[in-house]
Amino acid sequence: MFNIDEVYTISSFLSVCNKTIENNIPTCWLQGEISNLTRPASGHWYFSLKDNTVQVRCALFRFNQRYIKFSPKNGIEVLVRVVPTLYEARGNFQLVIQQIEQIGIGNLNLAFKQLKKDLDNEGLFDNIHKKPLPNTINTIGVISSSTGAVIQDIIKVLNNRYPFVKILLFDSIVQGQDSIKKLTNALNIADQSGKCDVIIIARGGGSLEDLWAFNEEILARAIFNAKTPIISAIGHETDTTIADLVSDIRAPTPSFAAMLVTSNRLELLSNTNKLYTQLHQSYRQTLHYYQSRLNQLKLKISNPNKQIDYLNQKLDYLSINLTTRKESIFTLNNAKLNSLFTTLKQHSPIKTIKHAKSLNQMSLNQLKYQIKQIINTNNNMLYLATERLQKIIMALTNKHKARLSIQANSLHYLSPLNILARGFSITSDTKNQVLSSVTNIKINQTIITQLDNGALYSNIEKIEKN
């Protein structure tokens, strides 16, 4: 606040003025024409914004330029979001620009925001409507231009990671007046064909006008109504379209979309080999157990051959005894012979042998039945083990796919190149020492500014401390 009784210095007066402006005039949108545009080596842009009667100085600093999709020029009409401020070093009133758009681009943005709001209110973006990817993907439909680099990138990634998958290209132009009709028709054909397990709709980066077909309501509703899971891979990561919001999954790039729908074949082969080894070991252990069990059961079952041998030996003994004594027995007592004959008949070895054979056959039948039961039990256990293995393979596949997705996202967001791509830079001296303060910099010193796609070499003309 101003104190009418205080005598101010110029710097303190301008400081109070600046604070008064910043605290009382909010951020606002202005429309005007660019003039007197200058672009010094610092990377900041300075120009005047004018209408038919007045003009005002504006500053667009480098860190606010990262999302600008056009090159400002003198004479073009723009829509700017500004913060009023006072440049105290010279006492000049100026507007610091936070956002700038061409007038035509501004209309597209308004249309985008309105459609986004309407579809969001209808629930088209709600997660409850998002379809999950199938566990097994054999055929991938791709909606893109057959002559663009996007389809080649997708094919390359799929061939490297999982060459067994089938790719169906539904060719369509991806920008221009007829693109929305072509894209929608291609999507409907791919979805209604029933041949695709998942559909990728993709194109490379471009301006808002280039990507506008993907912001049309007709395409958004076609994606929402599709029965097949849809993955959008449109533009760069910083580009967000209506199609991205309504799709089941949004991939930052077409190549990443191809990675999402495939598993690494080497990893799958390795996991399959491990599971096969585990299954083989389990099978051998189970087989060994039941073989031991079978041997134990065999020992418990008496051998009928021993009984037969015993009876045969007894028969031989009786025959010999009968031969040596038959004369004396015959002469001694015919009645006793008849009695013995009757006794022998009652204890006929043939009858005993038949009975022993009958017991032997019953034992064999029982043994066959038990062996058959053991085999059936083993087959059931093998079937259950195979089924359990399939579930384990499926679970491991899903687990590694989720882990790969998380790791890929983490790697992408932690990449230093990604930071540079968002408009940040790294400044160092000619000895590659990173400069984080103006205290270590001298006038006429050469500094190097590292950007995403190259480096800038600058000479220091002036140093201002905050």
Curated annotation (Swiss-Prot):
GO function term, MF aspect, one: exodeoxyribonuclease VII activity
Catalytic reaction list: Exonucleolytic cleavage in either 5'- to 3'- or 3'- to 5'-direction to yield nucleoside 5'-phosphates
Keyword Cytoplasm: yes
E.C. number: 3.1.11.6
Location, primary (coarse class): cytoplasm
UniProt xrefs under InterPro entries: Exonuc_VII_L (IPR003753), Exonuc_VII_lsu_C (IPR020579), OB-fold_nuc-bd_dom (IPR025824)
Oligomeric and partner information: Heterooligomer composed of large and small subunits.
Family the entry assigns: Belongs to the XseA family.
Functional note: Bidirectionally degrades single-stranded DNA into large acid-insoluble oligonucleotides, which are then degraded further into small acid-soluble oligonucleotides.
Protein name: Exodeoxyribonuclease 7 large subunit
Organism: Vesicomyosocius okutanii subsp. Calyptogena okutanii (strain HA)
Protein encoded by which gene: xseA
